[in-house]
Amino acid sequence: MSAKPTTLYDKIWNDHLVHEAEDGTCLLYIDRHLVHEVTSPQAFEGLRTAGRKVHAPEKTLAVVDHNVPTTDRSKPNPDPESAEQIAALAENARDFGITYYNEFDKRQGVVHVIGPEQGFTLPGTTIVCGDSHTSTHGAFGALAHGIGTSEVEHVLATQTLIQKKAKNMRVTVDGQLPDGVTAKDVILAIIGEIGTAGGTGYVLEYAGDAIRSLSMEGRMTVCNMSIEGGARAGLIAPDAKAYEFLKGRPLAPKGEAWDAALRYWETLRSDDGAHFDHELKLDAAALPPIVTWGTSPEDVISVTGRVPNPADIADEAKRLSKERALAYMGLTPGTKITDIKIDRMFIGSCTNGRIEDLRAAAKVAEGKTVNANVNAIIVPGSGLVKEQAEAEGLDKIFIKAGFEWREPGCSMCLAMNPDKLAPEERCASTSNRNFEGRQGFKGRTHLVSPAMAAAAAIAGHFVDIRDWH
């Protein structure tokens, strides 16, 4: 009798299941643990208090990213609390024998950029980090998700995690993406379709022609924002693109170990006939460049659209929520998206801070000038991304056009470092969240692709990137 067809998620889960209790609570083995300065201090302190060691320091990688300034790092950190967290991570990594990339190491960068970059992220592995956007690593066919600080301590101490199994959802995007439509638009469209709670209780597997056609950078963008759709994690079955990306990376397997790993990785795909608890299908050809208008990632609209009118919403709770969002964003129903002017622009983050993203922005920026009313910053996702961009001359294109070229870090994605919006400043951002205050107190965030962000910085307002050239 043939084995029951299983999903990619099921396969990885089953390969890592240590124990399952009668109530469905499971103990899962964790292959990789990424650590940063914000969610780890209490976890390490818990280990010290209990007299425990890190169970598998070689399976743990630490980097500083959330709090580091992206300007001159030879100067002291202006925020004492941030400086304390950074110093604590350095001390904890040293005391517990963990590899650590500090702010002066060219390998330093946003944790979800450096994991794949170093080959620490591998197909078929379980990966956790005290950060919600750990789902990024699912682009390589890894089961990756964020955990809380107490769970960080548990993984450090035991290399296991207590979990309950999620359900399976497959999101299939077939067809060819039109010019000007990117991975960022794909995932924003998916979130717009299912809402920020639509993926709750699920692990999403992304499939279809349009997903397979994406580069690894594009796939990371899609998986990165799975959490904004409410999902536990996002997955894409690994293929030749993933293997090519990883081969030769510093921490990837070498020689015979690579060959053995590859044989396993090639089994990592959902079987024909595998059961998914929910299915969603999208037509890639119908997707436009997208801009968010409100204070939730589900508040999406085509760049050719107009700010929606909450009065058209029948559900009272939802109507009141959208009215609040419009008031916070300072927008009037019926306003053309292309008439919305911006004050700031941010290209970077674990969503869109990779070399492909910077190339797309540079293509838009070349020979142009940033609008006099816009402050625009570009923050590479890692020191190695920065190094590559500079080798390609992208930094010169940006600087000549009037963009600020910064050091790597999380930067303006979140208001935990000096890069913040002032109250009521409006920002075109390539990050992943547009919540109230996310980029600074009373700051107004519109999520877009790198090309759309660069074009808005130059025009001073949102434009349809399809008309740019």
Curated annotation (Swiss-Prot):
EC number from the UniProt entry: 4.2.1.33
Residues that hold [4Fe-4S] cluster according to the record: 350, 410, 413
Pathway: Amino-acid biosynthesis; L-leucine biosynthesis; L-leucine from 3-methyl-2-oxobutanoate: step 2/4
Reaction equation(s) it catalyzes: (2R,3S)-3-isopropylmalate = (2S)-2-isopropylmalate
UniProt feature coiled coil, ranges: none
UniProt enzyme class: lyase
Co-factor binding comment: Binds 1 [4Fe-4S] cluster per subunit.
Residues passing through the membrane, by range: none
Keyword Transport: no
InterPro entries: 3-IsopropMal_deHydase_lsu, Acnase/IPM_dHydase_lsu_aba_1/3, Acoase/IPM_deHydtase_lsu_aba, Aconitase_4Fe-4S_BS, Aconitase_4Fe-4S_dom, IPM_dehydratase_rel_enz, IPMI_cat
Keywords, ordered alphabetically: 4Fe-4S, Amino-acid biosynthesis, Branched-chain amino acid biosynthesis, Iron, Iron-sulfur, Leucine biosynthesis, Lyase, Metal-binding
Family: Belongs to the aconitase/IPM isomerase family. LeuC type 1 subfamily.
Function field: Catalyzes the isomerization between 2-isopropylmalate and 3-isopropylmalate, via the formation of 2-isopropylmaleate.
Subunit record text: Heterodimer of LeuC and LeuD.
Protein name listed in UniProt: 3-isopropylmalate dehydratase large subunit
